[in-house]
C-alpha cells in the first residue's frame, strides 16, 4: 500500500511496519490482532462521549480517551522523526510534517489539521450531531458495504445535506460564500 510506504510509519500497537490504516482515525496498524487491540477500550474507565460516538470515531478532542503508553511513545517518535529544522519559522506549516507521514491516496482530498480542529470546535456541527437520526445515518454509512450507493441515498436526506454543507462551509469557506 503506497500510503504506508513512508519510512516513519509504524503500527500503533506493536511498532512493526504497518500494512493498513484504521478507517476511522487513519492510524497505521499491521494486522487484525493489532487492529482489534487498537479498537478495544483500555481496561480503565473511558470518558463518556457526549455524542455517544465510539472512542476511535469521535473527532471531538475532549471526547477521546487518553492515549496509552505505546501510542504516546509512537507520537513522540513520529514528532521527532517528522519535525523539520526551522529556518524561517513563519514559513513552516505544521501540516507539512504530518502530511508527509499520512500520505493520503488523493492529495486534493486531504483536510488540513487546522480544518479538522475547526470541525471539532464548530458549535453548528455539534448541534447537528446531536440529532439521533443523523448519527444513525453516519453509523450506517460507516458500516455499509457499498458506501458510494448509500452516500447517494444519504444526500437525498435534507438533514444529511445540511450536515455536509456545514462541514464544507468549515473546510472550504471561500468556495461556499455567496458573492
Swiss-Prot record:
Modification type Phosphoserine: residues: 104
Gene3D superfamilies to which the protein is assigned, alphabetical: 3.30.60.190
Keywords: Cytoplasm, Metal-binding, Nucleus, Phosphoprotein, Zinc, Zinc-finger
Positions contributing to Zn(2+) 1 binding: 11, 14, 30, 34
PANTHER family found in the cross-reference section: BOX C_D SNORNA PROTEIN 1-RELATED, ZINC FINGER HIT DOMAIN-CONTAINING PROTEIN 3
Ranges annotated as HIT-type zinc finger: 11-49
Domain of life, source organism: Eukaryota
Molecular function as annotated in GO: zinc ion binding
Subunit relationships: Thyroid receptor interacting proteins (TRIPs) specifically interact with the ligand binding domain of the thyroid receptor (TR). Requires the presence of thyroid hormone for its interaction. Interacts with NUFIP1. Interacts (via HIT-type zinc finger) with the RUVBL1/RUVBL2 complex in the presence of ADP.
Record-annotated disulphide pairs: none
Entry annotated with the keyword Hydrolase: no
Amino acids binding Zn(2+) 2: 22, 25, 38, 49
PROSITE patterns membership: ZF_HIT
Subcellular location: Cytoplasm; Nucleus
GO biological process: box C/D snoRNP assembly; maturation of LSU-rRNA from tricistronic rRNA transcript (SSU-rRNA, 5.8S rRNA, LSU-rRNA); snoRNA localization
A Pfam family the protein falls into: ZNHIT3_C
Any one GO CC term of the record: nucleus
Gene that encodes the chain: ZNHIT3
GTP-binding in keyword set: no
Protein name, entry field: Zinc finger HIT domain-containing protein 3
Amino acid at each position: 500500500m503506497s500510503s504506508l510506504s513512508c519510512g516513519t510509519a509504524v503500527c500503533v500497537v506493536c511498532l512493526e511496519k504497518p500494512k493498513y490504516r484504521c478507517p476511522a482515525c487513519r492510524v497505521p496498524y499491521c494486522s487484525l490482532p493489532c487492529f482489534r487491540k487498537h479498537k478495544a477500550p483500555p481496561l480503565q474507565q473511558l470518558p463518556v462521549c457526549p455524542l455517544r460516538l465510539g472512542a476511535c470515531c469521535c473527532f471531538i478532542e475532549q471526547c477521546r480517551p487518553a492515549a496509552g503508553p505505546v501510542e504516546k511513545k509512537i507520537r513522540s517518535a513520529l514528532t521527532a522523526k517528522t519535525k523539520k529544522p526551522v529556518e524561517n519559522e513563519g514559513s513552516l506549516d505544521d501540516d507539512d510534517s504530518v502530511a508527509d507521514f499520512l500520505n493520503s491516496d488523493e492529495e486534493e482530498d486531504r483536510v488540513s489539521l487546522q480544518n479538522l480542529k475547526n470541525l471539532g470546535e464548530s458549535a453548528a456541527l455539534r448541534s447537528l450531531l446531536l440529532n439521533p437520526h443523523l448519527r444513525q445515518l453516519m453509523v450506517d454509512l460507516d458500516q455499509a458495504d457499498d458506501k458510494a450507493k448509500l452516500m447517494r441515498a444519504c444526500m437525498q436526506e435534507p438533514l444529511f445535506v445540511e450536515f455536509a454543507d456545514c462541514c464544507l462551509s468549515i473546510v472550504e469557506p471561500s468556495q461556499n460564500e455567496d458573492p
